[in-house]
Swiss-Prot record:
Cofactor: Zn(2+)
Reactions catalysed: Hydrolysis of DNA containing ring-opened 7-methylguanine residues, releasing 2,6-diamino-4-hydroxy-5-(N-methyl)formamidopyrimidine; 2'-deoxyribonucleotide-(2'-deoxyribose 5'-phosphate)-2'-deoxyribonucleotide-DNA = a 3'-end 2'-deoxyribonucleotide-(2,3-dehydro-2,3-deoxyribose 5'-phosphate)-DNA + a 5'-end 5'-phospho-2'-deoxyribonucleoside-DNA + H(+)
Assembly information from the UniProt record: Monomer.
Keyword Lyase: yes
Enzyme Commission number: 3.2.2.23, 4.2.99.18
Keywords of this entry: DNA damage, DNA repair, DNA-binding, Glycosidase, Hydrolase, Lyase, Metal-binding, Multifunctional enzyme, Zinc, Zinc-finger
Physiological role: Involved in base excision repair of DNA damaged by oxidation or by mutagenic agents. Acts as a DNA glycosylase that recognizes and removes damaged bases. Has a preference for oxidized purines, such as 7,8-dihydro-8-oxoguanine (8-oxoG). Has AP (apurinic/apyrimidinic) lyase activity and introduces nicks in the DNA strand. Cleaves the DNA backbone by beta-delta elimination to generate a single-strand break at the site of the removed base with both 3'- and 5'-phosphates.
Zinc finger (FPG-type) boundaries: 237-271
Protein name stated in the entry: Formamidopyrimidine-DNA glycosylase
Family designation: Belongs to the FPG family.
Length: 274
């Protein structure tokens, strides 16, 4: 599933081709994704794309005729093509945004769990209304995390994956960050110390920044807009490595379902206090 670094990579990849361009048409081949594709997309002919930015795992295509909210879902990806290429349509190519200068933004989604919605202003849309701070922003601090964790009995892994606390820390990067911080994923959030919060915030920022630089993580479906895979999978420390040796201590990486998600951790480097 594309997480924050993958969405950020997609945003950076498509922006140079689209910002400042006018929309010629939006072709919707599959109107039923996670939610029905907004009918307003058919009225955006002539709209100028002002900016493309990311909020949580949503890509916002801001235009002078309203904003398009795109979520990649479980298996979605965006590619940039030229009308001149005349590339064949894949059965999973559900939406094309075509600009007047001949650029195609093509949305491919085998599992059809993504989102293409219209809003007059994205920031006031219900989907974005109750989100926590961005993890790479100055608002996400150790003091903030410590304060939010008080009286929270939920496992710390679930806690940092809660978008109301902080956005965009998905399963892969939660596992990796907790390993780097030396924190067991089942530790109750309320038991985090101020020092642990400081370390955790630091490594979350480090892990996400590194993943963005390397183009995201390619595990199953994610491909960058230029067709290249992400490379962060090559340096994963615990995620997907059940039964393998820990790179730090040599112990065997374990896996457990926490909050309906597979969680990977080192039992020695991430001890759970008794």
């Amino acid at each position: 599933m594309p997480e924050l670094p993958e969405v950020e990579t997609s945003m950076r990849g498509i922006s140079p081709y689209l910002v400042g361009q006018k929309i010629k048409e939006i072709i919707v081949r599959q109107p039923k994704l996670r939610w029905a594709v907004s009918s307003e997309l058919s009225t955006m002919q002539g709209a100028t794309i002002i900016e493309i930015y990311r909020r949580a795992k949503y890509l916002i295509i801001q235009t002078d005729k309203g904003d398009i909210l795109v979520h990649l879902g479980m298996s979605g990806s965006l590619g940039i093509l030229s009308v001149k290429e005349n590339k064949a349509i894949d059965k999973h190519d559900h939406i094309d945004l075509i600009t007047e200068n001949g650029v195609i933004l093509r949305y491919n989604d085998p599992r059809k769990f993504g989102t293409w919605l219209w809003a007059e202003q994205a920031e006031t849309a219900e989907l974005l209304a109750n989100l926590g701070p961005e993890p790479l922003s100055e608002a996400f601090t150790s003091g903030y995390l410590f304060e939010k964790s008080r009286n929270k009995t939920v496992a710390v892994k679930n806690f940092i994956m809660n978008n109301a606390i902080v956005v965009g820390v998905g399963n892969i990067y939660a596992c990796e960050s907790l390993f780097m911080a030396g924190i067991h994923p089942e530790l109750a959030a309320q038991n985090l110390t101020a020092k642990q919060c400081e370390r955790l915030v630091t490594v979350i920022k480090e892990v996400l920044t590194k993943a963005i630089i390397q183009g995201g993580t390619t595990l199953k479906d994610f491909i960058q807009p230029d067709g290249k895979p992400g490379y962060f999978a090559q340096v994963l420390q615990v995620y997907g490595r059940k039964g393998e040796e820990c790179n730090d201590c040599g112990s065997i990486i374990e896996a457990k379902v926490i909050g309906q998600r597979n969680s990977f951790y080192c039992p020695k480097c991430q001890r759970l206090p008794k």
